Amino acid sequence: MSEIVVLKLGGTTLVEQRQVLAEVATIARRRPVVIVHGGGKRMTEWLDRLGVPTRFDGGLRVTDAAAIEVAAAVLRGVVNSELVTALHDVGVDAVGLSGVDGGLLVGERVAGIGLVAHVVGIKRDLLDAILVGGQVPVVAPLARDEAGIVCLSLIHI
C-alpha cells in the first residue's frame, strides 16, 4: 500500500465547501486517504439548543459529562454521517466511524478541561483493513482515555 494521506476537515468545510470534497475525491483516486473531521460549530449549535452550557479555556472547549454526550451524538450521528454522504455524492467510497469504534483512538486527558484528550495511540490495523478494501475511513474526533472513558479528541495534523 502506498503512503497514506491524512486529511483534517473542519466543520465549516463539511457544510460549505463542496470544492474541497471534490479535491478529496481526486486525491482518494490516487492514494489511500484517511479523513478526520471536526464539528465544533455544530456541537455548539446543539449544546445551545439543548441548554447545555458551553465554556472555553484558552480556545479549547471545556467538556463535562453532559457536553460529551451531546458531542458524541452530534459528531457521530450528524457530522460524520453528513460528511460520508457528501463524499459518496462525489464518488468516494467512504466509511464513517469514530475514534472509539474498535478502540481506534487512545487519548490522554488534557488537565483542566474535562473530557478532552490528546490522541496518543492509533489502532492502525483497523484503518489498514478499511484502506485495503479500497474505502476511505472518515473518523469522528472521539477517543477513549486510559480509563476507557469517552473524550473529545484533539487531533493535530
Which stretches of residues belong to each language-model region?
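N-terminal glycine-/serine-/threonine-rich phosphate-binding loop
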Residues: M1-I35
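Short, ordered loop/turn segments at secondary-structure junctions
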Residues: G10-T12, G38-R42, G59-R61, G99-G102, ...
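Short pre-catalytic strand/loop immediately N-terminal to key active-site residues, enriched for Gly-Thr
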Residues: E146-L152
